Amino acid sequence: MVETFKKIGIYAGIVLLLAGIAYGFVPQVLDGKIVNQSDIAGWKGMAQEALEYNKANPDDPTAWTGSMFGGMPTTAITDNFEGDWTKPLYKFIMMGKRPGSYLFVTLLGAFLLMLSIGTSKTLAVAGAIAVAFCSYNMQIIQVGHNTKMQAIAFFPWVLAGVIFTYKAALGGQIRKWLPKTVLGAVLFDKTAL
């Protein structure tokens, strides 16, 4: 029991360390300051006409705007996301101040990814820092490619999930039938398995 609490304490400490690193990199967000993202300012200009129309006509939202390229569909600019059941979960995961929350989610996911490939906790923390703070991530945060950064933040989570699932599938009885299902039973001597 004591050993279990010790392990939980170590991982809780690592999570707090990763949160400290994420928000230590952008402490200004804790004071309410925001990153001036040029693409977000551009989006506000692109979407303004459609947003104003939709606010004035909630029963008849527009699917077209004249504010870009002489006219274009609004689905590429703004859309109605009612009925998206993942939104509450997503808001919970990204509940911190942005861009600190992007960095924290990336750090935590990359830490799990490093653990999934069998690295030590220390090396996993170092690898997570390398993944989260690569120069591309900093560039896309600065210009305002927020949805791209959010997608990148979840890449390590997905990869770690696949690896952990694969490793779990290799345990126990599954190990005996997996080669047959993947490569075909004709390649194996049935008595050897």
Q: Where do the PLM segments sit?
A:
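Membrane-interface coil-to-helix junctions
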Residues: 20-107, 129-156
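Membrane-interface helix-boundary signature
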Residues: 6, 10, 95-98, 158, ...
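Residue-level signature of transmembrane alpha-helical entry/exit and packing/kink sites
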Residues: 7-14, 103, 124, 148
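Juxtamembrane loop-transmembrane helix junctions in multi-pass integral membrane proteins
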Residues: 4, 90-93, 119
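Short alpha-helical segments and helix-capping/turn motifs at coil-helix boundaries
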Residues: 2-7, 48-49, 108-113
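Membrane-embedded helix bundles of polyisoprenyl
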Residues: 107-117, 122-193
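Start-transfer (signal-anchor) and selected internal transmembrane alpha helices
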Residues: 1-26
